[in-house]
Amino acid sequence: MASKVSPSCRLVFCLLISAAVLRPGLGWYTVNSAYGDTIVMPCRLDVPQNLMFGKWKYEKPDGSPVFIAFRSSTKKSVQYDDVPEYKDRLSLSENYTLSIANAKISDEKRFVCMLVTEDNVFEAPTLVKVFKQPSKPEIVNKAPFLETDQLKKLGDCISRDSYPDGNITWYRNGKVLQPVEGEVAILFKKEIDPGTQLYTVTSSLEYKTTRSDIQMPFTCSVTYYGPSGQKTIYSEQEIFDIYYPTEQVTIQVLPPKNAIKEGDNITLQCLGNGNPPPEEFMFYLPGQPEGIRSSNTYTLTDVRRNATGDYKCSLIDKRNMAASTTITVHYLDLSLNPSGEVTKQIGDTLPVSCTISASRNATVVWMKDNIRLRSSPSFSSLHYQDAGNYVCETALQEVEGLKKRESLTLIVEGKPQIKMTKKTDPSGLSKTIICHVEGFPKPAIHWTITGSGSVINQTEESPYINGRYYSKIIISPEENVTLTCTAENQLERTVNSLNVSAISIPEHDEADDISDENREKVNDQAKLIVGIVVGLLLAALVAGVVYWLYMKKSKTASKHVNKDLGNMEENKKLEENNHKTEA
């Protein structure tokens, strides 16, 4: 027996079919959701009092409906249709708000809320839009370098997993790059994942670089739409190595050119301003037309003065692109004549010359026994004090370490010379006898006494300085005696004697010998006296000349006066004679 369907059920079924076909409603309403979030769609219908149930459906691309959720107003129960893509993802609230968890791109559909009464069906459509933020763009497949004046692929800017697809923009130093024929070419490509329906967008940039692009940052960005509107994400900056040809060559000298001296090692370094810099060059040495192929450095060892000249380097393939420099190898020669150890006799003449040859003006310093001399030594008559160690030293101040020195060890020899002096002590009880000796090598002194007498003290000797020293004894002779002083060195033996009266007999004392220092003082005083005398003589001579000129003029004047007086007297005598004749 067939079941009977009530008239009200038949009416509801007809209304649902007609609602599915006619799709009346309140108009379009859009819900934006982020990928992976929960989509919340309010029903947007006022719930009628005689509501029987509510349903949600979505429409396929061909317009056919697919029911997904049902809620009864009387039984307060919820039922979800067996739709695989929405299994365990749906939630229908009491106010008929539908929530879809874990939003997917496939959820981007037209959903419809349906409220059904016994006599009517009310619909409210909702359009769902799902957005997926893309990954941060990155520049991949980067060119290891870019060459000037060549259109070359710089790299790819890629942004993954976006929905809808984004738009990529390239920037140079923060400014947008636009396609320019022959200079900038941009190729855009997008791909969609069949499973996730997400887009991967790629933009390839071909760029013709110039030297102005050195250290310039390149970036890219992706612009996309999200639930709240348009947004942009930027990549990290990338700086590319720019290759460009060498336009200028420079040459450097190590060590610095003004400090090169004989014996140094010179390194020539040639540099090109290209990138990458040239690795090989041609080096040209003075007087050698053929170049030497080498790396960017060329070293000359133990250079001599003949290495002075012009040096040049050039590119291997462009000989006209070259650089040159002038190198001066500083030198310093010193010749001392005589040098080494020289033995001369006292009174001899010894010319000494220190000859300098240098690349620049050199300073010359003379030292004697480590004491600086005011002038170079000159020996017209050698003295014992001239003996010593002489050093001629020269240096170039501008060149560190360039100095030379030669030494002369002068030995002044002489036979012993003796002078004896005596002096009575003011007390009158003793006499001091001194034997002054000159000579080199140092003579040995011996005393002998002839006659009776006694030696009060032992022999006393002075220091041996500049070939001189003395020996003295103190005696108190009771009678006249003769003292003999003997001085002997490798050259000769010299003897001198001195008669000394008894202590009771007064006698004339002989002055001590003048020391070198006192002799110099005496010489200085003598020079001063001679200068004063010469000055006085010159003054007297000038005064005499002046006096002679004065007297000469005076005599000339007196002659004229006497002549006039004589003429007057003669005239007077003639007149007197005339008077006598007349008488």
Curated annotation (Swiss-Prot):
The chain crosses the membrane at residues 528-549. Glycosylated. Residues 562-583 are annotated as: Disordered. It is found in: Cell membrane; Cell projection, Axon; Cell projection, Dendrite. Glycans are attached at N95, N167, N265, N306, N361, N457, N480, N499. Residues 550-583 are cytoplasmic. The keyword Repeat applies. GO terms for molecular function: identical protein binding. InterPro entries: CD80_C2-set (IPR013162), Ig-like_dom (IPR007110), Ig-like_dom_sf (IPR036179), Ig-like_fold (IPR013783), Ig_sub (IPR003599), Surface_Rcpt/Adhesion_Mol (IPR051116). Residues 28-527 are extracellular. It is a single-pass type I membrane protein. Detected on brain motor neurons, in differentiating retinal ganglion cells and in adult retina. Detected on leukocytes and on lymphatic endothelial cells. Detected in spleen B cells and T-cells (at protein level). Detected in adult brain and embryonic spinal cord. Expressed at high levels in the brain, and lung, and at lower levels in the liver, and the kidney, as well as by activated leukocytes. One of its GO terms (cellular component) is neuronal cell body. Disulfide bonds join C43-C113, C157-C220, C270-C313, C354-C392, C435-C485. Residues 245-328, 333-409, 416-501 form the Ig-like C2-type domain. Residues 1-27 form the signal peptide. The keyword Nucleus does not apply. Residues 28-120, 125-234 form the Ig-like V-type domain. One of its GO terms (biological process) is motor neuron axon guidance. Homodimer. Interacts (via extracellular domain) with CD6 (via extracellular domain). Homodimerization and interaction with CD6 involve the same region and cannot occur simultaneously. The affinity for CD6 is much higher than the affinity for self-association. Interacts (via glycosylated extracellular domain) with LGALS1 and LGALS3. Interaction with LGALS1 or LGALS3 inhibits interaction with CD6. PANTHER family: CD166 ANTIGEN, CELL SURFACE GLYCOPROTEIN MUC18-RELATED. Cell adhesion molecule that mediates both heterotypic cell-cell contacts via its interaction with CD6, as well as homotypic cell-cell contacts. Promotes T-cell activation and proliferation via its interactions with CD6. Contributes to the formation and maturation of the immunological synapse via its interactions with CD6. Mediates homotypic interactions with cells that express ALCAM. Mediates attachment of dendritic cells onto endothelial cells via homotypic interaction. Inhibits endothelial cell migration and promotes endothelial tube formation via homotypic interactions. This is CD166 antigen. It comes from Mus musculus (Mouse).
